[in-house]
Regions:
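Catalytic machinery of carbohydrate-active enzymes
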Residues: 1-318
Length: 318
């Protein structure tokens, strides 16, 4: 194996990049001396170039660009695209020895040497790792956690600490945003459950200026803000937390990948973006057509209680 080429999905959102991180980590774990080249359509080079496991980033816009990115001497090609025939054809023309891709009842299914069936009911980050496991078995959950532990390592002693991390963002629009007012009500209920000394950290991005102003105006000593913090620092924050509660947004996938006790709040069931595990829970409106803010703080509190009880039981048992 001389070089590993990874075609990431043609999606510019932060969450789409974060769910690819454990895949890149695992590839570098297997082949530490080999170059990893990430190829993408979108302008996401700054994200991937900052990673310790990526040696080169190539932005491609045409079929020719993609084809040139896969050299004849490339030993491994991993396609994280779910349905494009383009990447099967590129692999057919270049024929790297190891060709990994998703099966989805297309003719390109025949081209992969190792594959995993695409299923929209499976968390996308888990699916990426199961694709790799078709080549060599490993524990996807352990690999994901180790990935974010590796990113977090420089920040583990200095990152902000909180019992509960709350992520009220939602870059896709208001329909994905359970309101800040609801998060504050939930925080008050969680204090009754966890104790008056419970500390909360709100993770905010550029789009949450209104939420930032509102939180600062509250002057609550139990509330802190992490604004526009880098992914390695947020990884350390999530790994320290007793609980993470989040809307369906990019940073939520740091918490899910880090295997933190997690409650996700969704406007509708969205299993492709929620990693279903015993220490995680998804909350959706009883009638999705009524909108995300019909979810009450008590609805979310019930999910938090279940996740916390399971996590405490596992911690005690271990």
């Amino acid at each position: 194996v001389s070089e590993i080429v990874v075609y990431v999905r043609s999606q510019p959102q932060l969450g789409d990049q974060i769910v690819a991180l454990p895949t890149l980590y695992q590839l570098k774990t297997w082949w530490s001396s080999k170059r990893i080249k990430v190829v993408a359509r979108d302008d996401v080079g700054s994200f991937y170039r900052a990673l310790p496991w990526v040696d080169e980033f190539v932005r491609a816009s045409t079929f020719g660009d993609y084809l040139r990115s896969l050299k004849k001497e490339t030993g491994v090609c991993v396609s994280l695209h779910h349905s494009s025939e383009r990447f099967g054809l590129i692999n057919l023309l270049r024929l790297p020895a190891i060709r990994l891709g998703f099966r989805n009842a297309r003719i390109s299914d025949l081209i992969w040497t190792h594959c995993h069936r695409k299923n929209t009911a499976e968390y996308i980050g888990q699916a990426n790792l199961r694709l790799l496991a078709s080549y060599r078995p490993f524990d996807p959950e352990r690999a994901a956690r180790e990935c974010f532990q590796a990113l977090a390592r420089p920040h583990l002693r200095t990152a902000q600490r909180a019992d509960v991390v709350m992520i009220p963002g939602g870059g896709a629009g208001a329909f994905k945003r359970w309101s800040l007012a609801n998060y504050v009500r939930l925080a008050d209920r969680l204090k009754q459950l966890l104790g008056n000394g419970t500390r909360f950290l709100f993770v905010l991005g550029r789009q949450e200026a209104t939420e930032r102003d509102a939180l600062e105006a509250m002057h609550r000593p139990d509330f802190a803000i992490a604004h526009c913090r880098p992914i390695p620092e947020l990884s350390a924050v999530m790994l320290h937390a007793r609980l993470v509660v989040a809307n369906d947004c990019g940073p939520s996938h740091i918490a899910q990948g880090a295997c933190a006790p997690y409650v996700g709040i969704f406007n509708e069931p969205n299993p492709e973006w929620f990693w279903q595990r015993p220490r995680s829970a998804a909350v959706v409106p009883r009638r999705p057509e009524d909108g995300i803010d019909t979810i009450t703080p008590d609805d979310v509190l019930g999910a938090c209680r279940k996740v916390l009880e399971h996590h405490a039981h596992i911690a005690y048992a271990g």
